[in-house]
Every structure is written in C-alpha cells, then in structure tokens.
Amino acid sequence: MVQVIESRFMSSASHLDNAPPPNASEIVFLGRSNVGKSTLINTLLNKPLAKSSSTPGKTQLINFFASVWVWHNQRLPLTFIDLPGFGYAKVSKTIKKEWERHLLNFLFMRQSIKLFLHLVDARHTDLAIDTSVATMLEQICRGDQCILRIYTKADKLNQSALNALYKRVYIQKNKVQGVDTDDTHTQSLLFSAISKNHRKMVSLTHLREEIVKYTLGLENGI
C-alpha cells in the first residue's frame, strides 16, 4: 500500500525554459478542460493543491507539485505536472498553436518524465482531441516511459454504458477511435474519485500503486 507522506505546490512555468529543474521522477497529467485533472491530482496527493479555473481553457501554465510517497518501505520523491487543459481554450488560433508547440516541446525534451496520465471523460471516449493526444503520446513515448489512460467520471455512466466501457477497456484491450494502444507502454483504467469499492473501477489505493509501478518501470520490464 502506498502512503502519501507530504505534498506541496512547487511552481508554475509557461514553457521548458522556466520550468523547475528536475530532481525526481515526473508524472504528467494531460486531458481536456473539465475532465477532472485537478480533482484527480488533489485526490492522489491527499491535499487540495491543484486549482481549477471557472473559465475552461483559461490557464496556460504548467503547474508542478512535489510529493513524497512510501511504497514497500521505499521512500519515493515524485513530481506531478499538471498541463493546461486542452480543447476549450478561449484564445486566438495563433496563440493556441504557439501554446501547443511549447507543450509538445516540453513533453519531448523533459527527460525526467516517466509516466503520462492521459485523462479521458468516460462519457465521451471517442473525441477527436483525445485521439490526437493518444497518437501524439504513442509517437513521443520513449523506452523508459509509459502511458496510463484513465477514464474519469465513470460513476456518471449508467450500468449499461459502464459495462460496455469496462468490456472495451479490459477485455478488448481498448482502442481509442482506431488508435491501437495495446502495447507494453500503455494501460487503461476506469476510475472515479467518488465511487468506492466498485468492482468495475480501480480504487484509489490501486491507482496509486499502478502509478508507482509504471513510474519505476516495473509494469513493462524497464
């Protein structure tokens, strides 16, 4: 079982040049605006550190959070990176393209990133923007990195829709609108920060353990 010893906000950055120097393994959160990134980060870190804007897509900063976890008596300093939500940004196309270029450069050049957490709204699983992100991650993912796709807000699905998504994710090994993600670098999980002990959704305890294993390279033989 993973214990969260401490968590704190580190700093914000607009691009790679003014990001804090890497001093721990890093986990990056990507997802559309309002997909639940802030909620998931705060739940994982056991502290309300990530703030969500009332205007979707308004925040254009990369936020860094430091946390110390203990797993099997091993002390693990980790850095969690919250990227700006994509899809709803109310900015000009020129600014948006420049913003996306900086983010892609950050993801590609930041050698300390070990795990990408791609959050997808369980109610809207085949949006073009998520397909683009899935494709991009598959293209830039290095041999020492992994991708963990987390379907959020699964508690909002009715039983029939939940069963269908469960079958797609765990039995059919999940494809996101034609993008084959069934490889050693990618895994998908159903999660809800609200529902507890639901047999079709992973628990918070299990999710933390999966994050640790993927970050350390234990799940794909790194």
UniProtKB/Swiss-Prot annotation:
GO cellular component: cytosol
Disulfide bond annotation, renumbered to this chain: none
Gene Ontology molecular function, alphabetical: GTP binding; metal ion binding
Entry keyword Magnesium: yes
Pfam annotation, one family: MMR_HSR1
Swiss-Prot/TrEMBL keywords: Cell cycle, Cell division, GTP-binding, Magnesium, Metal-binding, Nucleotide-binding, Septation
CDD domains in the cross-refs: YihA_EngB
Domain of life: Bacteria
Residue span(s) of domain EngB-type G: 23-217
Binding residue positions for GTP: 31-38, 57-61, 82-85, 152-155, 191-193
Described function: Necessary for normal cell division and for the maintenance of normal septation.
Family to which this protein belongs: Belongs to the TRAFAC class TrmE-Era-EngA-EngB-Septin-like GTPase superfamily. EngB GTPase family.
Entry protein name: Probable GTP-binding protein EngB
Gene that produces this protein: engB
